[in-house]
């Protein structure tokens, strides 16, 4: 029986020439819990990447809009095309579950952009643009819209857009023919909490929202009875220990490959937190919150074997690796750190053999 093989894609805030990263591609050693550099893609400020649900294509933010790539058999990336988003550089992107549309979140201009996807994975025309409006509380990052994450519900009916400037998540109905969005609901968060990222459980019935400035995760149930989206909060849980750095910002959310665990990181506190997900209720149990031996972790992810963990440390320009015992709540540094300029997002991808 052949061993499963994976590559890891790491996006970076870099100018993307031969000396300055772009997207890094690594071979994954599951036994050692380590990454070995394989290739890199020249692209400017690839602040976030996503892989299509059919696992065929990778899409990336860039200074010039978005770039599309065909994932090759060995995990390397073949460029398809680029497309403008008619605005400032985005910070997050995702696709719908039918691979018909690409959604881009605009932190700097508070904009949501919808682009059509073609059958060959290329990005087509813009079908909708929504400039979020309003004034938030008077704070450095919370006085105007900052759309930081856009994700479809797993039933593929609604787009949820986290606005950390306005402290809420807008819920839009997607017109699957025209690619237009219509506001249906608003999930309101605590003032100055800054909802940053969101994820839906594997069955689509639970929504997790991490709040950057207040360092906690809200857990909601999601139902769509009578074609009406309803979200009910069932839990709020901190991303920090009782003892922690005075200034900290919760970062991205990542599921384990089996959807049994949820991972986040705390920039400033420089720690990673792992939760066990209750299979029946979706509630979170904090297993540990421990230091990551780097500065300002923007992303953290479990390896596909759930025995190792990777942290992307934005300010120290490093990746750090750990062995993990999830049941015992242990995290032990594993091997030397790797230098990588301004890492921001990590994705593990299983290769077809």
Regions found by a protein language model. Give the residues of each.
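Short loop/turn segments immediately following the C-termini of beta-strands
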Residues: 13-15, 61-63, 107, 117, ...
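Asp-box/WD-like beta-propeller blade repeats and closely related beta-sheet repeat scaffolds
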Residues: 78-149
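Beta-rich, blade/repeat-based domains predominating
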Residues: 17-19, 43-53, 86-97, 133-154, ...
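Short loop/turn segments immediately following beta-strands, especially the blade-tip
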Residues: 26-33, 69-76, 115-124, 172-180, ...
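A short beta-strand motif characteristic of beta-propeller blades
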Residues: 36-42, 78-84, 134-140, 182-188, ...
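Blade-loop segments of beta-propeller domains
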Residues: 37-99
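Loop-centered beta-sheet repeat module
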Residues: 156-215
């Amino acid at each position: 029986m052949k061993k499963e093989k994976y590559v890891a894609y790491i996006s970076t805030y870099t100018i993307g020439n031969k000396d300055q990263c772009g997207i890094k591609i690594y071979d994954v050693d599951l036994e050692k819990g380590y990454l070995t550099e394989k290739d890199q893609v020249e692209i400017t400020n690839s602040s976030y990447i996503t892989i299509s649900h059919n696992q065929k294509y990778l899409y990336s933010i860039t200074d010039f809009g978005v770039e599309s790539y065909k994932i090759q058999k060995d995990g390397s990336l073949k460029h398809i095309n680029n497309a403008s988003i008619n605005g400032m550089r985005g910070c997050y992107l995702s696709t719908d579950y039918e691979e018909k549309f690409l959604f881009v979140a605009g932190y700097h201009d508070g904009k949501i952009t919808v682009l059509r996807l073609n059958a060959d994975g290329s990005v087509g025309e813009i079908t909708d643009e929504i400039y979020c409006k309003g004034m938030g509380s008077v704070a450095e990052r919370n006085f105007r819209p900052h759309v930081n994450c856009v994700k479809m519900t797993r039933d593929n009916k609604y787009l949820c857009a986290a606005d950390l400037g306005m402290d809420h998540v807008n819920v839009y109905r997607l017109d699957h023919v025209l690619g237009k969005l219509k506001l249906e609901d608003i999930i309101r968060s605590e003032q100055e909490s800054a909802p940053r990222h969101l994820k839906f459980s594997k069955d689509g019935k639970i929504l997790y929202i991490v709040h950057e400035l207040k360092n906690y995760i809200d857990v909601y149930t999601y139902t769509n009875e009578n074609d009406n989206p309803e979200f009910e909060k069932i839990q709020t849980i901190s991303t920090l220990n009782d003892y922690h750095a005075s200034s900290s910002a919760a970062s991205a959310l990542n599921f384990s490959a089996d959807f049994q665990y949820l991972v986040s990181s705390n920039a400033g506190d420089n720690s990673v937190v792992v939760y066990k997900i209750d299979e029946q209720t979706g509630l979170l149990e904090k297993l540990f919150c421990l230091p990551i031996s780097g500065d300002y972790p923007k992303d953290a992810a479990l390896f596909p074997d759930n025995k190792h963990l990777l942290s992307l440390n934005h300010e120290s320009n490093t990746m750090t690796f750990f062995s993990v015992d999830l049941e015992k709540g242990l995290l032990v540094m594993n091997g030397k750190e790797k230098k990588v300029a301004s890492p921001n997002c990590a994705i593990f991808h299983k290769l077809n053999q």
